[in-house]
């Protein structure tokens, strides 16, 4: 084998989801009331560089961004398990309402995920909340939810290959993100 970490899950899975969701939003029967931004950030592993740049040089007024949904590593581990990070640990409880919206949308899915909030704690030793791009949005007061299926032995390793992705799970997480995005996009109030 080689020594290249191809990143099928970290973060090919999130990129695939973002493309699929953007396409579904564009070609769906009804577009959301709010505009949507689909943003890929670079330099996450080097210190959240891309998201830091974006929130400090946004392409739209920063106060017009009502929520940030982050999908990173969403294609592995138990088929019914999804970790959500942000609603409990975000500053000033700014993401609690968005977290409640995610919970209600998940409950309405044909096969709801078993949600684990283990990482949604400031005291968690892995500090997951501070390790992905949603963090910079939260620092600007934007409600966030980070969707992940969790860490695995191939994280940042050559074994993070497409053959290990659970594509059914990836599709289900993508559908949930699409449905949450539509709910946020059609809500009359900001998810504060």
Task: Specify the residue positions occupied by each region the protein language model found.
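Metal-dependent peptidase/peptidase-like ectodomains
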Residues: 41-146
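Secondary-structure transition/capping motifs at alpha-helix termini
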Residues: 24-34, 58-64, 108, 187-191
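Active/binding-pocket-proximal capping segment
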Residues: 11, 36, 73, 87, ...
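His/Asp/Glu-rich mid-to-C-terminal helical/loop segments that flank catalytic regions of hydrolases
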Residues: 148-192
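C-terminal soluble interaction/assembly domains
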Residues: 7, 21-31, 51, 55, ...
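Solvent-exposed, polar/charged alpha-helical surfaces in well-ordered, non-transmembrane soluble domains
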Residues: 16-23, 52, 96, 100, ...
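Alpha-helical metal-binding/catalytic segments enriched in His/Glu/Asp
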Residues: 1-48, 177
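Short beta-alpha connecting loops at secondary-structure transitions
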Residues: 3, 80-91, 157-168
